[in-house]
UniProtKB/Swiss-Prot annotation:
Keyword field contains Flavoprotein: yes
Disulfide bonds: none
Native source organism of the sequence: Salmonella newport (strain SL254)
Family designation: Belongs to the MSOX/MTOX family. MTOX subfamily.
Pfam families listed in its UniProt record: DAO (PF01266)
Cofactor: FAD
Protein name, entry field: N-methyl-L-tryptophan oxidase
Function per UniProt: Catalyzes the oxidative demethylation of N-methyl-L-tryptophan.
Upper lineage: Bacteria, Pseudomonadati, Pseudomonadota, Gammaproteobacteria, Enterobacterales
Subunit structure: Monomer.
InterPro entries per UniProt: FAD-dep_OxRdtase, FAD/NAD-bd_sf, Me_Trp_Oxase_MTOX, MTOX
Length: 372
């Protein structure tokens, strides 16, 4: 059987692409080296932030607004919502470049973002402590996503729509010819007119020339009481320290508050190098500078996990066809801020398989930018 689209890597982007392409009437084969959702990539750990006024640049705003609409639609397929509208407050020095981008995005796209000085911040959320020169940009319409529930939902919906799924079967080789794309797996060879490579952190095992650097990252859950929960209207957050370190976190659930450090981490080259949480001496204490200064009421570390970022050189996404192979789309280099975009990236992949022109300007995400 020849498929219209083979998906190599069915984590966040691949799971979304499988659903949207199958729903559009295509014959799709989803593959993954493991059984998604799993612990080997970048999507585990229960939750991920979604922000609309985007500190990483205005070019992402049209994508994330479309993603939000798709998240809202996906949530209708579950009793438990995938998107939780907790609001997100971005904390940092008043002269922060990240916050300037947030404000600029909000103004350009007329997003609902409220600026709070340090006094107003600490009045609204007494649990938060910040220096006098800090501000907060609060986006009430943002929040967080239940990442593993999202992937489970996409996989179920795709399967119910007739999508073929081949999991626990790594792809060892990809071959291109005039008839399309052939992949080799432990279960045999499969053929399609087009392919999506969304293999995340380990994409270089299949396409070594891609400029992607795997980085080991950790996040952890700390003891927190009901003051830090959504029931008390405590928001999700990002926080920039005076030295430039960037943190992110979520409202407490079941008396546990999850937090991670966005920058830093350990460069790795192979999956076996991603040691579990606490294997690196600094893991348990990584969030202490933020907690001690900004959330001093949070208790000790309860448990944690390790994941992997697939960083591009400029930490912007890579969304492009492989050079010389216009029938193969690669989406990678999401650099630790990609999950929120998964549905729109999956939709872009489905449109690629359908031969449709993208609805967005993807020029900033082309591979050619690295050779200029």
């Amino acid at each position: 059987m020849k498929y219209d689209l083979i998906i190599i890597g069915s984590g966040s982007v691949g799971a979304a692409a499988g659903y949207y392409a199958t729903r559009a009437g295509l014959k799709v084969l989803m593959t993954d080296a493991h059984m998604p959702p799993h612990q080997q990539g970048s999507h585990h750990g229960d939750t991920r932030l979604i922000r609309h006024a985007y500190g990483e640049g205005e070019k992402y705003v049209p994508l994330v607004l479309r993603a939000q609409a798709l998240w809202d639609e996906l949530s209708t397929h579950n009793e438990e919502p995938i998107f939780v509208r907790s609001g997100v407050v971005n904390l940092g020095p008043a002269d922060s470049a990240f916050l300037a981008n947030v404000a600029r995005s909000a103004q350009q796209w007329q997003l609902n973002v409220e600026r709070l000085d340090a006094t107003a911040l600490m009045t609204r959320w007494p649990e938060i402590r910040v220096p006098d020169n800090y501000i907060g940009l609060f986006e009430a319409d943002s929040g967080f996503l239940r990442s593993e529930l999202a992937i489970t939902t996409w996989l179920r919906l795709a399967r119910e729509a007739g999508c073929a799924q081949l999991f626990n079967s790594p792809v060892s080789h990809i071959h291109h010819d005039d008839n399309g794309v052939t992949i080799e797996t432990s279960e045999g060879c499969y053929h399609a007119s087009k392919a999506l490579i969304s293999a995340g952190t380990w994409v270089k095992a299949l396409v070594p020339e891609l400029p992607v650097q795997p980085v080991r990252k950790v996040f952890a859950w700390f003891k927190a009481d009901g003051r830090y929960s959504t029931k008390n209207r405590f928001p999700a957050f990002t926080g920039e320290m005076p030295n430039g370190d960037q943190y992110y976190g979520f409202p407490a659930e079941n008396d546990e508050l999850k937090i991670g450090k966005h920058n830093g981490g350990q460069l790795i080259q192979a999956q076996e190098e991603r040691k579990p949480f606490a294997a690196v001496a600094s893991d348990g204490a990584e969030a202490f500078p933020f907690l001690r200064n900004v959330l001093p009421g949070i208790g000790g570390c309860l448990h944690g996990a390790a994941c992997t970022y697939d960083n591009s050189p400029d930490e912007d996404f890579i969304i492009d066809t492989l050079p010389g192979h216009e029938n193969t789309l690669v989406i990678t280099g999401l650099s630790g801020h990609g999950f929120k975009f998964a549905p729109v990236l999956g939709e872009i992949a489905a449109d690629f398989a359908l031969g449709k022109t993208p609805s967005f300007d993807l020029t900033p995400f082309r591979l050619s930018r690295f050779s200029q």
